[in-house]
Amino acid sequence: MDLQAQLEELKTKTQEALKQLNGDHSKELQELRVAVLGKRGTLTELLKGLKDLSNDLRPVVGKQVNELRDFLTQAFEEQAKVVEAAKIQAKLDSESIDVTLPGRQMKQGYRHVLTQISEEIEDIFLGMGFQIVDGFEVEKDYYNFERMNLPKDHPARDMQDTFYITEDILLRTHTSPVQARTLDQHDFSKGPLKMISPGRVFRRDTDDATHSHQFHQIEGLVVGKSISMGDLKGTLEMIIKKMFGKERKIRLRPSYFPFTEPSVEVDVSCFKCGGKGCNVCKKTGWIEILGAGMVHPSVLEMSGVNAQEYSGFAFGLGQERIAMLRYGINDIRGFYQGDSRFSKQFK
């Protein structure tokens, strides 16, 4: 059989072999390609016969060989696409999903109880015309202490153990620095300042059932003309009644805070026994809930506010304490352990 006839026969047999590889036969297709077009394949062996042809016939047959190589290369590429499509379809068929089956319910997350308490308190104050102001958790000693009427040699600094980063930079021990910064910027020609500053604060406490090295506070500040202790009492009564019920009463006890004068501790009538005395209120009928007072004139003066013309009141309450009292939680550490079973109770 001459070389041209062998080339034609190779073309015919290869086409027939390719037609048999319609399914997932990628391995067989590769083996056939190597057998026909590889370095030791049939076409390569036939090329060796060109040297035995006459000078007139060699170019003609050489062209035929090149055309056959191109034809077979394209045929293998097209068949490879067919085989790959068959492979994908077979995988889809084996991994088919019955869309009529019921889905698996995702586990539901829960808003943290402290988030709920914070948002509830913020909504109350927004309804009373207060603005919410955020501030820095890493604060300057100047704003955290000195602007709160606590100079470096003030003995009251011993009341708070502090996380210092440098000599003058610390983790804030209260959100009062936000009030000082806001007081600096407020334009009293546009009206009084009414604000709250919620956020995390940090103290060097040993963690136990009632203490934590970090906790949350919401501090409030109102400064304007003719602000009195009566305004403070009325504001606190409204907050307490909205938080703990309309039947709740408050009482003010004299206390001491460096940044307010006079200062008071605020108690709420026990919401468990109604003031009769129980284990929650320690048989007193009252529960300590927050601290407050009239803004110290020195604090106003340090912000450039004329203390003869303006006065104000400030207060601070802790979200953890409110949550513990409201829900009977006896260990503050439960707020920070990330246990969904704990959060689920307050959904």
UniProtKB/Swiss-Prot annotation:
Enzyme Commission number, as recorded: 6.1.1.20
GO molecular function terms attached to this record: ATP binding; catalytic activity, acting on a protein; magnesium ion binding; phenylalanine-tRNA ligase activity; transferase activity; tRNA binding
Reactions it catalyzes: tRNA(Phe) + L-phenylalanine + ATP = L-phenylalanyl-tRNA(Phe) + AMP + diphosphate + H(+)
GO biological process entries: phenylalanyl-tRNA aminoacylation
Cofactor(s), by name: Mg(2+)
UniProt: Mg(2+) binding residues: 261
Highest taxon above the source species: Bacteria
Places the protein is found: Cytoplasm
One of the record's GO cellular component terms: cytoplasm
Pfam family, one: tRNA-synt_2d
Record has DNA repair as a keyword: no
Gene3D superfamilies: Bira Bifunctional Protein, Domain 2 (3.30.930.10)
Textual note on the cofactor: Binds 2 magnesium ions per tetramer.
Keywords: Aminoacyl-tRNA synthetase, ATP-binding, Cytoplasm, Ligase, Magnesium, Metal-binding, Nucleotide-binding, Protein biosynthesis
Listed InterPro entries: aa-tRNA-synth_II, aa-tRNA-synth_II/BPL/LPL, Phe-tRNA-synth_IIc_asu, Phe-tRNA_ligase_II_N, Phe_tRNA_ligase_alpha1_bac, Phenylalanyl-tRNA_Synthase, tRNA-bd_arm
Residue stretches spanning the membrane: none
Family membership: Belongs to the class-II aminoacyl-tRNA synthetase family. Phe-tRNA synthetase alpha subunit type 1 subfamily.
Quaternary state and interactors: Tetramer of two alpha and two beta subunits.
Protein name: Phenylalanine--tRNA ligase alpha subunit
Originating organism: Streptococcus equi subsp. zooepidemicus (strain MGCS10565)
Lineage, top ranks: Bacteria, Bacillati, Bacillota, Bacilli, Lactobacillales
